[in-house]
Amino acid sequence: MEFSVRTIINNKVYINGENLLHAMCRHGNSLALSIIAQSINKNYQYLLNEYNREGRKCIHIAAVMHKGQVATELIIILLNFGADVNGRVLCTGDTVLHIAVYLKDYYLAEWLCRRSGININARNICRTHTISNSTEEKR
């Protein structure tokens, strides 16, 4: 049996709730991600914006798992093939910019702010009341 990217994509192989592109972003191999992303036509472009079991898209995984230039390179590849720069994590509403700032990845955050199409005013789910409630409970 011949092993090919098309076979993996057509059969939708999922490992731990992630598609092939999620796994590539998690491992940070920009060359492999680029090769696989190039083989994706419009019929499979949805894989770029598909959520994993943690409620994250490929772009979020790249920002969480990697920092600086590595994260930026992965995200450039994803955006060039149709990923949504303003896509949100399901449970928090975070965008990739929220993640970069939260993780203090200022290289990525600055790069994102220079991109056209980025929503720098995007709001996520506010956690302020949760933090203040948990602080009061500890007193």
Curated annotation (Swiss-Prot):
InterPro entries, from UniProt? Ankyrin_rpt, Ankyrin_rpt-contain_sf, NF-kappa-B_inhibitor
Which Gene Ontology MF annotations are present?
Answer: NF-kappaB binding
Instruction: For this UniProt record, give its keywords in alphabetical order, as a comma-separated list.
Output: ANK repeat, Host-virus interaction, Inhibition of host NF-kappa-B by virus, Repeat
**Intervals holding ANK repeats:** 16-48, 54-87, 92-122
User: What's an example GO BP annotation here?
Assistant: symbiont-mediated suppression of host NF-kappaB cascade
Q: Where is the signal peptide?
A: none
The keyword Metal-binding is assigned to this record: no
Report the PANTHER family cross-referenced here.
Answer: NF-KAPPA-B INHIBITOR ALPHA
Return the similarity comment: Belongs to the polydnaviridae I-Kappa-B-like protein family.
Give the function comment from the record: Suppresses the host immune response through NF-kappa-B inactivation. Possesses ankyrin repeat domain required for NF-kappa-B binding but lack the regulatory regions required for dissociation from NF-kappa-B and degradation. Therefore, prevents host NF-kappa-B release and subsequent activation.
Stated name of the protein = I-Kappa-B like protein N1
Q: What is the species of this protein?
A: Microplitis demolitor bracovirus (isolate Webb)
Q: What phylogenetic lineage does the species belong to?
A: Viruses, Viruses incertae sedis, Polydnaviriformidae, Bracoviriform, Microplitis demolitor bracovirus
